Amino acid sequence: LIDKSEEFPSKKIVSIFVNPLQFDDSNDYMSYPKTIEEDLEALEKREIDYVFVPTREEMIENLTESNQLPWGFSNLLCGSYREKHFQGVQKIIRELFQIIKPDFAVFGEKDFQQYLLIKYINKQYFQKADFQIILSPTIRMDNGLAFSSRNIRLSDNQINHAAVAFQSIKNTVLDYFHETSLFNFENLIPQPGRITYQYVKLYNEKYLFDKHGLETDDNFKQKNFRLFIALVIDDVRLIDNYRVERYDVT
């Protein structure tokens, strides 16, 4: 995200806050990696102007009530598995933007549904035409697994196992889709074992924007699709997505 931000002429502020409102399971919140000292040490080596590390009380005590989110945030992808997750994210991101008042904000492509939420928050509450929300490409390990805060909870063996699982189901589903133009992937998903797939979904990007209360912009087209995968390896949940470009199912 920092590398991507360097493309834009602006002061750079990194915010670090593990949002308790976005966790449905208190155990998940407690086990989520919190590496503030390591983060600050790493940031010292980068050209960052400010680091914003608010306390829980500073971010939560005086939150403004937020509106109900569009259908997609509770019925599609992570929204269908994590009740009130995006409502919790909305409250904190809205507060963050009110405090910082950014001209640019950089978010990762791996969390694509969160990116849609950020765009919705700007549309709903700020309506700043000159506020640019930047989508930063997913950074991957050599084995193809997307970097994630949760990876720190995985052993080397688990990391390699997860990478194979993502790549395998991706190849299987896309081969099937390109051959048939069908979306019924249920029979292609392996039975739960060490790895359990929560969802494997392929959506048209315009459909995603529509269902999340947004209009499609020039970077997202009718003919582009995106494959979303969520899996749990042992007790660690990982997500990823891949853009499928220029495939016309009509």
Would you name each region that the model predicts?
Residues 188-250:
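Phosphate/ribose-recognition catalytic cores of enzymes acting on nucleotide-derived substrates
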